[in-house]
Amino acid sequence: MNRQDHGPAAVQTLRWREGRLEMIDQRVLPARFEYLPFTSAAEVAEGIRSMVVRGAPAIGCAAAYGVALESVQLRGATREAFAVGLQRGFDVLAASRPTAVNLFWALARMRAVWDANQHRAVGDIVDCLLAQAHEISADDVRINRAMGAYGAALLADGARVLTHCNAGALATAGHGTALGVIRSAVQAGKRISVIADETRPFLQGARLTAWEMVQENIPVTLITDNMAGHLMSRGEVDAIVVGTDRVAANGDVANKIGTYMVAVLAQRHNIPFYVACPLSTIDLAIPDGAAIPIEERAAEEVTGFRDCQWAAKGVQVRNPAFDVTPAELVTALITERGVLRQPNRTTIAGLFAT
């Protein structure tokens, strides 16, 4: 198999077809592989909220297309009605999920295009917004490949790499962030094997990461989240690479719940802990991790699945979707501009000064 041309690395998590957005329904993988159609901002927002699409970069791309879809729906409207309707689309998308900063970054890019073209005819604005959504998606793939090249150099031939959640092609417009690093290392000829945390409660590691790796014949071993420390203590993990949904100005990292636990264990066992992080995921307006909003999801994700209930009825549940890993536990951020070791407020600000 040519890994550059087949498998999830080439799968389009989002695609524009015949005037509508289609997204892989990640809730039903790996049992079924199917695309769902979306024709409005409200539909895309619900797709984000219900986890049809997930992963910070993919959410950002979806939101951009959501704005474009809303503008397409309004192509025949008056200028005033177009403005009201498009603003409604921005609002519903912004309210879909609070933690992934790429959502707001992409909406800001779309709004900048709208602001710069308000003097033009409505049809021209629609064309500009759709072009920008396509550009955001293409940029994401380019950035992921750049990060992958930088990150691949950090992994030794034969490395056993543990990852948490899914930061692969499915979480982006293509190639992936954390899994993009692994893909790039494999494409460079390195023998890499993956240890995938199952990532309770939504099982992104078991359902999505394991699927991506199996499809590409990259060796992968699935473990439950509470096995990670045991494997580290036995010397069976050489490096950890994860993605992120938001990085604060001081380098604190918000990622899928359980990441903090993995980082603490990595420090205890002297294992490098890398975070694959496009610059669009760094939020300089957030001073530190304590200020990052953490989404709390439904109790039903923890107590059971569909018709199977494994927890006692009436039990109280906490279900934060993310946690924060302090910057001092991060060996390096892997960005499209290079590897930033021991990230802090000064070095992160420097990334944006170049």
Curated annotation (Swiss-Prot):
Substrate binds at R54, G55, A56, R97, Q204, N255, K256. GO terms for biological process: L-methionine salvage from methylthioadenosine. Gene3D superfamilies: translation initiation factor eif-2b, domain 1, Translation initiation factor eif-2b, domain 2. Keywords: Amino-acid biosynthesis, Isomerase, Methionine biosynthesis. Pathway: Amino-acid biosynthesis; L-methionine biosynthesis via salvage pathway; L-methionine from S-methyl-5-thio-alpha-D-ribose 1-phosphate: step 1/6. It is an enzyme of class 5 (isomerase). The active site is at D245 (proton donor). SUPFAM superfamilies: NagB/RpiA/CoA transferase-like (SSF100950). Catalyzes the interconversion of methylthioribose-1-phosphate (MTR-1-P) into methylthioribulose-1-phosphate (MTRu-1-P). This is Methylthioribose-1-phosphate isomerase. The lineage of its organism: Bacteria, Pseudomonadati, Pseudomonadota, Betaproteobacteria, Burkholderiales. The gene is mtnA.
